[in-house]
Every structure is written in C-alpha cells, then in structure tokens.
Amino acid sequence: MGLEARHCCMFLLVFASLSVEIRADCSKDCASCALHLGQQREINSLACTLECEGKLPSAKAWGTCKELLLLTKVDNVQDGEKYQDNNDSHYAAKKYGGFMKRYGGFMKKMDELYHAEPEEDDAGGEILAKNYGGFMKKEYDSDRDAADLLRELLATSGDPESSIYHDNNSETPGEINKRYGGFMRGYRRSTDLEDETSGIQKRYGGFMRRVGRPEWWEDYQKRYGGFMTRFTDSFLPSDEDGESYSKENPDMEKRYGGFMRF
C-alpha cells in the first residue's frame, strides 16, 4: 500500500513539473506574439495562454500566434545562414587579402556558371568521341605510336649493337620493360664488348676515347691544315725511327702500341 502511494506521489510531481514547463512555454510564446504584433486586439495574452494550455478551445488568438512563431523561426534560420556566409567571406578576405575583395565575386559567378562535377569531367572524352567520331581516336593513336617510336629510338640510340644485347639476353621484352623500362636497353651490351670496354676504361679513362682512335690525327690535320704537317715533319719521328724504337723497347710497344711513337 505504501509503495503504491509513493508511485502516485511521484507521478503527480512529474505531471506538475511538466505542467509548469508547458505553462511557462505557453506564457513565453504568447508574450512574444503580443510583442511582435503590437496593439492588435485579436491577440490577447491571457486567452492565448489558456488556449495553448488546453484550458480553452483553440481559437483565433493561439492560431495567429502559432503562425507568427513559425514565421519567426524561418527568419531566424535565414539570418543564421546569412551570418555564416558573412563569416566565410570575412575569413576568405582575411586569408587572401585584397585579391578576394577584388576578384571574389567574379570567381564565384564563374564557378556558378561553369561548375562541373567529376562525373561530367570523366564524360568529356566520351562526348568528344561521339561528336568527332574516329578522328579523335586516330589522333590519339598516332600520338601514342609516335611516343612509342621516340622512346624506342632513345632507348637504342640508333646503335646496331643493341640487337646483340637482345639476342644474348634471356629475358623477354616484357620482363625487361617491367624491370628496367627503356633505359637499360640503350646502354647494356654483349658480355665480350662489356669486358673489353671496361678494361680500356679502367686503364686509360676518357683519355683513350679522345686520342686512341686511329683517325684522331687526321682530324687534327684537317682542323689545323698545313701547320700540323710542318709540325709532324719537324718534331715527330718517321716510321723507320718508330720501328727501330719499337724493337729497342718491346715492352713499351706492347703496352702502348703505336701511340708512343708520337
């Protein structure tokens, strides 16, 4: 019995508190309506409050107040959006200085007129293909073929020895492209040529590339004309002297060849 009485008391307290809150909200809403509408006779604060609490049948006073409250909420939402836009504009002006102040409206207008979604960007190629038929495809294929041909020429550098590398290499072209791309094809050679070149490079460096060629002397003669001819006649030994020198110094001849005659 005591437990039921306790539950009833708790229920009455909760109902009373809710009634007080509802009464306070109704009084506040009706007072706000009376303040906004001014001295209109059809709005009576007391009647509006009683109608809101349900003590009187709903009449014109509470209905007019509800409409006014809805309009007020809409205005508050719009004011909040304007305030947010103003804050964004102020932040952009603070970040970018006078640039946004000068060109911001123009950029915003252009974005509204020509704004494109990512799906529209992806569909741009399809639209071109539909409008121009196979023309765009041919241009794309020709550009791709030209790029592949140029890459192949740069990779091989026009050197016929590259075919030797392709014959001696056990890897397939697909594996080569996957591993090195087109870079290593132009610089790797056969095993014999690599050993010979590395030995000369290790021993003489870049010096032999300039003067170790048989035609290097002819190049100088063509470049300097009769001056080099007179120089060779005056200072350089003849072939007979060079042969005698080679016989006297076989080690030098073996090591440096005909280069030491000069």
UniProtKB/Swiss-Prot annotation:
Top-rank lineage group of the source organism: Eukaryota
Post-translational modification: The N-terminal domain contains 6 conserved cysteines thought to be involved in disulfide bonding and/or processing.
Subcellular location: Secreted
Presence of keyword Signal: yes
Cysteine-cysteine disulfides: C26-C48, C30-C52, C33-C65
A single GO cellular-component term on record: dendrite
Propeptide boundaries: 110-131, 139-177, 190-201, 211-221, 229-253
Any Pfam family: Opiods_neuropep
InterPro entries per the UniProt record, alphabetical: Opioid_neupept, Proenkphlin_A
Keywords: Cleavage on pair of basic residues, Disulfide bond, Endorphin, Neuropeptide, Opioid peptide, Secreted, Signal
GO biological process, any: sensory perception
Record bears the keyword Signal: yes
GO molecular-function term, one example from the UniProt record: opioid receptor binding
Signal peptide stretch: 1-24
Its job: Enkephalin neuropeptides compete with and mimic the effects of opiate drugs. They play a role in a number of physiologic functions, including pain perception and responses to stress.
Similarity field: Belongs to the opioid neuropeptide precursor family.
The name this protein goes by in its record: Proenkephalin-A-A
The species this protein was found in: Xenopus laevis (African clawed frog)
